[in-house]
Each structure stands twice: as C-alpha cells, then as structure tokens.
Amino acid sequence: MLNTYYNPVRTYQGVGSLSVLTQLVSSLKPGRILLLIWDESVLKNRYIKETAAAFADILTVKTFAWSNPEMFQLYEIYNETKNENYELVIAVGGGSVLDVGKSLCCLYAKPVDSLEAMRNMIAAKTYSKPHCKWIGVPTTAGTGSEVTCWATVWDSEHNKKYSVDTQDNYAYAAVIDPVLASSMPVKLAVSSALDAVCHAAESYWAKAGNTVSRAAALSAIKIIMDNIDGLLCGKEEAHDAMAQGSMLAGLAFSNTRTTACHSISYPLTMKYHIPHGVAVSMLLAPVMRLNQPYIKNRKELFNAFGVESVSELSEKVTAILEKSGSPAKLSQWGAKESDFEELVAHSMTKGRADNNPAELTAVNVEEILRSVF
C-alpha cells in the first residue's frame, strides 16, 4: 500500500523559539504586514514587540477577540483590511485567530463586496490561491492550526460550519513558544489539550491515515496524556509538553483530517456552546468503541493513552474534564433527549463522517450521543 505524507510548514518549537520571528519576517521581504492578535497583552512579549518595532513603518496591528469565528466577523475584518495589499499575515493567538489569519490570505486574492458573496464563495470553495503568506504563532496548545492548511468558519445564523481549505494555504512558518500559553486558565488549557488528543486519535484511525501520521499521532497522545496531570496542577513544564504534543497532533491530522468525534461535535458546540475541546473529548471513548474492530494495532493506541480498554479511557477523560471544571455529560450543558433527532441530522459532516473507519448511521450516532447524555 502506498504511503504519502506532505507538510511544508517550517516549525520552530520550544522555549525561546519566538526569537526567530524577526529574522523570519525579514527573510520574506514583505511590502505590507498585518499582525493579527487575540489581545494586546501579546505585544508585551519581548520578541513580538521587537518584530512590531522592526517593521513599524509597514506593519498594522489588528485585534480579533472572538472564539469560533463567525462568517460575519470574518467579513468585518476582511472588509476593514482588504485594501491594504498585505503580503504577509502574522497570526498570534488561539486557533480562531490563526483560522481568521489564514482565511484572509485566500479572501484577499479574490475580492468580494458583501457578506453574502463571501458566504457563497466559501461554501462553493471558489476562492483563489492565497494572495499572501502567513506565519502562525499559537498562544494555546491544542488546535494545531499553525500546521494545517484549512480554517474553520462558523455560520450560526444558518446553522452551518464551513472550511476555507486549500493545499496552497499552509503557513510559511509556525513558531510554537510555550511561554505564550503559560498564562492560559486551566480549564481552557485542558480543553485545548484534549482537542489535540482527539486530533491525534482520529488521525490514527482515519481512513486517510499513513505511516508518518500514525507515528506522529502516537507520540502526540503519549506526550499529552503523560503531562496532563501536571497541566491540571499548574506545572510550568507541562505547557512545553502540551505545545509539543499539539504540534505533533497537528502534523498528524494535517494529512488525514478528523473523523466522527469532530463530525458529531460540531452541532454540540453550535447548539449548546460547548467548548470545542470539551465536545470532541466527550465523544472520544464512544467513537473509539464503535471503531475498535477497524483499528489496526489498537494496543499501541491504548498504550499511548495509558489505558487497557475503552471503558478505562472513558473514565480517564471524564475525570480530566471534571477536575478542570468542565461538565462531562450533555445533559449538564442543557441538552435534552428531544434534541437528538436534530443533532443526528447535523452530525454527518462531509470529509469527517466519511473518513471514519466505521460507517456512521443515524442509529449509531444517536447511541453515541446517548452514551454521553
């Protein structure tokens, strides 16, 4: 069987890795730069401040302080910046900021004059190759967005989730310095870490998996699970481990996409506002139970998680969520059994559900939802 793997992102990971940022930007010789940030606190970082100062005459700072970016929010920042002819976007923030940054690179290439036109273009995937390069600087450890070529955009008004997705939109570079994530609240840090674990696990069993992605996935799971207790206790070294694990998980699923956990989680986040990492991790054990007959070398997967069975994994994830202060059952988030039909109908995301090794049906999706109700 042919195995192929491709990811062109230059990665710089570890404490102090931000020291390369100014040099990276300089090597690209950009005419205009957009520095997109989550909030202004990141500008206090020595190396980000140094970069902003070095290119002050060609650099504009914009703040995007929204989680799970909505279509109208993306349009607003696009409309504010579309005439600046940026040649480089530096996105500093969590997955939402990185997703908006990489989306803008594509949107700048094919101008639109209304929110509806942008929605239609993204839905039909008729956007062009990116107009500019981007550099990803994550301030959370979980999404892996800095090493993937797609971005998630939500459209709650129409109860939909879209992707801005093209192989040409990998970052020029990813700079993953755990110092930026060290001030994350524990609940957010754990949710992000569990999102990365799900990226890795789903990559491991995905139909599109390959030798390299599976190796990266196992490493990511082990690193994160070995250090998540330290994260719960606030240990500094745990943040470095989470940054490394998240990057490896991103490198794994950048080639495979995700599967049923993500597919079923989207309506849970949209309807009940369950944080993404919490929603996917709640589904991890029941989806693994469904997939078990199709997972090759599942003992390796159990070993990476530090468990011997799906039941033990379920208990472990539930305990982690509860220790972090996140409810682990749908009913605790306001879900009702009468919602199941609607949830099932919106759980079959193309490219996710059909990438799952076990076929997803209305019956088994409802069973999965009931198991975490």
Give a label for each model feature.
Residues 256-308:
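C-terminal catalytic subdomain
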Residues 9, 15-16, 38-39, 92-94, ...:
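Fold-independent oxyanion-binding glycine-rich loops
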Residues 150-256, 357:
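Carboxylate- and glycine-rich phosphate/diphosphate-binding segment that chelates Mg2+/Mn2+
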Residues 197-201, 242-250, 264, 284, ...:
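Short alpha-helical scaffolding segments that buttress acidic/His motifs in well-ordered protein cores
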Residues 72-79, 83-176:
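Glycine/threonine-rich beta-strand-loop-alpha-helix active-site module
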Residues 302, 306-373:
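C-terminal charged capping/lid subdomain of soluble metabolic enzymes
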